[in-house]
Structures are given as C-alpha cells and as structure tokens.
Amino acid sequence: MAEFETTFADLGLKAPILEALNDLGYEKPSPIQAECIPHLLNGRDVLGMAQTGSGKTAAFSLPLLQNLDPELKAPQILVLAPTRELAVQVAEAMTDFSKHMRGVNVVALYGGQRYDVQLRALRQGPQIVVGTPGRLLDHLKRGTLDLSKLSGLVLDEADEMLRMGFIEDVETIMAQIPEGHQTALFSATMPEAIRRITRRFMKEPQEVRIQSSVTTRPDISQSYWTVWGMRKNEALVRFLEAEDFDAAIIFVRTKNATLEVAEALERNGYNSAALNGDMNQALREQTLERLKDGRLDILIATDVAARGLDVERISLVVNYDIPMDSESYVHRIGRTGRAGRAGRALLFVENRERRLLRNIERTMKLTIPEVELPNAELLGKRRLEKFAAKVQQQLESSDLDQYRALLSKIQPTAEGEELDLETLAAALLKMAQGERTLIVPPDAPMRPKREFRDRDDRGPRDRNDRGPRGDREDRPRRERRDVGDMQLYRIEVGRDDGVEVRHIVGAIANEGDISSRYIGNIKLFASHSTIELPKGMPGEVLQHFTRTRILNKPMNMQLLGDAQPHTGGERRGGGRGFSGERREGGRNFSGERREGGRGDGRRFSGERREGRAPRRDDSTGRRRFGGDA
C-alpha cells in the first residue's frame, strides 16, 4: 500500500496535470489514486474496488489524460456512468484536470439532452466522451459516435449500472470497441455479473482494493429531509428558524447558487453572505473575519471555496445540495462540532438523489435518520419563545420608569373610555413582532409523501405489468383548471426559433417545478408564444422564467393579463392537445405538490430518461458540455 507521503509528481504525472491539480487544491494522492495511477500510466487494465468518495475519478482521469494525443480530434477516452448526474460530474472533473492541456475537449452524452446539441459537440472532435449507457448506445447505433481510435475505457460505478439494469447495454458497447484499448473498471461491490465482464473484456487486470477510511465524529448529529411540499429556499428558512445555532454554513453546488440562497436568506432577515471562487482573497478574508467575530451568522459556500475554513462558531451545516461523493459530505459536516462543541448536520435529498444518500450511508456505515419539515405550529411556538425571551430581557432592564410614565399619555380612541392595559399590551405586541408574525397561519394540507424507496424495492416493470387498457378506463379523469383561475403570459420564443409546444411545457414544468396539468393553453406565433398559467405566480418564479432559456433563447416572460375563455377543443400550437402530454409532476403556485413524474420515464419529446438531469440553464450557472441542454 502506498504511503500518504507520496506526491502526485512521484507518480509520474507531467507538468500540465500537476499544475491543474495545484490549481484545484490537491495536495497528495488518496490511497486509490496512489495505487491506480502508476498501473494505468503503464498501460495496465485496472479493477478498482472502492467506495464512492475515495477519489477514483482522479485515479482514472489523470493517467488516461496523460496518455492521450491532444492533436488527434477523435474520442480516445470513453467513460460510462450510471446516471447523468455522475456523467456531468466526471466530465466537469476531467475538464478541470485537463485545463492546461491545449486542444483537449470533453463532451457529456446523456438522455434528456437534445441530439442536435450532442451531434454538434461530437463533430468538434472531443478526445473524451463521458455518458450514460443508453445514450451512448443510441449514438453507436446511429453511427454518430466513432470509437475506432479509442485507447481508454472506464466503467465507473459498475455495480450501480448493474442495479439499474444497464449491464446488457454496457456489454453491447464494450463488444463494439476495437481491441488494444486499456480498461479500468471501478465498483464498490463485485457481484458475479461484474466479474463476468472482467473475465470477458479485461486483460489480466491489476486488482486494487481500498478499504474506506471515511469516518465521522459521534458529536455531530446528522439527519436528512426529503425535499417535498415546498421549495428548498422556503424549507431552508423554516429549518433555520427551528434550529438553535450560533453560526451556520450552507453548502451548494454552484457559484450562482451561493448568491441566490444568500439573497433569499437576506430577504428573510438573516445576516448571511456568499463565499465562492469569484471572490478575491481580500474579500474572502473579510467575509471569514465577519463570521468569526459574530458580525455574520450564515455563510453560503461551494466545496472549493470552503476549503481550509475553520471557524469554531459554526454549529450547523446544511447540505442544501447533496454532494456527489461521500468524502465531500464528511468534509462538509466536519466544519461543525469544532473545539469540543456539539454540531448539527442537515442534508436536503430529492427523490432522484436517493442513490447518493445510500452511498453516503454505506460508506460511513451508518443510517442517517429522516426528519420532517418544521410545521406552522412549531414555528409559532419557536417565535413566541424567542419573543418572550426578549421581553424578559427588557423586564430586567433598569430604565423602564421613563417608559412607564408614557403609558398615561397614550389615550384611548373614544372619549370616556378607560385605557385597557391588556389591550394596549396586545397592540404593542402586534407592532413589535416584526416581519415574522407570532401567529403563523396553519400549513395547507399536502398530498401524502411518496415512499422513499430504491428502484430495487419496486422491481422491474414493463408494459405487460400495466394491464389491458380496458381495465383502466374507470379511473377518474383529472379536472382541467378553470380558465378564470389562469393568467396569460408572453414569452419571446416562437416558431421561427424552432420551438415546439413540448419545449415550452418541459421548460415551465422543470424550471418552475409546476405540474403540467396546471399549464393551460399554449399558442405559437412567428416570433413569440403565449401560455396560460395559474394566478398568483410569485415574483421570484416569474423572474426565474425571464432568465430561463428555450433552445438557447431567453423566454423573457411577461404578464399580459387574465386568460380569455376558449373552446374546449382548441389545440395548443396547432398540434397535439395537452391531454396527450400530461404528467403528474410538479406543483401549482399554491404549493400543492405532485404525485411523481411520468411513470414511463420519458420526456415530452418521447426520449428515454436515465435519471432526471440536474436543473440547468444560464441562470443557475451549471457548467455545460457540448452546448445547451
């Protein structure tokens, strides 16, 4: 086993890669990196058995990048990943690792992204292709992905691909790759199906086994909340209000998210600030100093920006965006519980991210308990307790006499009416409560939360499981929302831009988290379109839609007024009626939540989805590969 004192330079990596590692803050290789990099540099096949979060992305990326030819504009490295989230993460990492290698391009291919975007990226001759099995196989069948020059193949999280039912696609892809290439396979477990692949496709692989060293301290209380019933920003405010903390750090994935979350917290009265890579060193140090001395209570940061952060005051860590690997999670929550203090760590998990939660639990060898969203009753109780504590503090002050003298000068509104001190106290209480009212309206009833289950628990499903159509005709149809509850909006994309109704529905449903059954009539014109949406759209949602892009053009959504009645047979955009494209996903503006996505796992375009893509447009700042999604 390699010693931790080994440096990346000792492993034989060249200057451009070492420079990139230095820029990224890498100091010394992890055990799996120290073991795998020399073998891969020497052209050996490698079979790596390590948990997520062990640093395996760098373990295979660095040596394969060093061995490729930047002058050859053809795919030389192919990485297979089980989900689009992991594919994007690996593509981002390989882009960072190769940033000082001139002429090296990376493209990510996954379901849900338009084919024309991916075809444009492939025509540019990327040397590195990262993708999900289904979409990669589609490109191979279409003849749009040429692997004749491939020199390196990586199967990342092979056991996860087996669990998700992709292993046949993986074998089909591997059978089409020319001989003479190098293969690296990484898996946390080694079931027989994976062993069969190693025997069939790998040449005397060097086995590398790394036991997880990821641990967490018992003085950090951990829990997770399944994102359900309201937006993450709204839920974050509730959790912060329900928690007792000295200072908190909130981790997000992108630089833009640090600013957006900080703005949301400032609007709700929290003293917060963003910390991201765009800040110069002087501003960064100033922000951290404010956090240390108590002038700042909440910091919103990315993983990179928070490296080296050590502030004893931090007693709460919120993983607003779940990290993609277990090691990052441990590093994040390690920011709390310093100097012998107890710490709290909260993790937000969306249903599509349950695999990442399972990886964290498996690596850390513990089960993280789930918590419920603080309800209105709890918030009201907390607010009253805090207010009562402030009142008690004032009751103990020594300068109340001069204020007591003012009571006699406050006259009742009606002549002859005596001043009722209890009523006066109630009026002053109402005035003093501030923006957070002491009386919290009860929560609106929500639909029951879906079970938080793995795909394995549901078992396989095909068309024959659904029963004959005649057996399903008694199901009640959902009622269409009355037009009187709708408003008409204009968006600046139209037929001349190549937009179709499905593009608009997808953008509104996904970016606004709105059920498509709450989307009304859509009409396409040459240079613009109109769309009906429920009344009461929050300003922040409209602002988000203004920046959201469809076919790489901003929507610039504007309210035109109330929707006008129209005939029930009217079709949207001159095409298929909306009833043929509905799905039970999203929510309306009143906060009603959906029952889930489309059961067949397909987008409005009919393309297969291999796991929902992370939301991304120019307003979120998510990095893109090969064009717009």
Curated annotation (Swiss-Prot):
Molecular function in Gene Ontology: ATP binding; ATP hydrolysis activity; RNA helicase activity; RNA strand annealing activity
Location in the cell: Cytoplasm
Catalytic activity field: ATP + H2O = ADP + phosphate + H(+)
Database matches in CDD domains: DEADc, RRM_EcCsdA_like, SF2_C_DEAD
GO biological process: cellular response to cold; ribosomal large subunit assembly; RNA catabolic process
Motif (Q motif): 6-34
GO CC, alphabetical: cytosol; ribosome
Binding site for ATP: A50, Q51, T52, G53, S54, G55, K56, T57
Family: Belongs to the DEAD box helicase family. DeaD/CsdA subfamily.
Name of protein: ATP-dependent RNA helicase DeaD
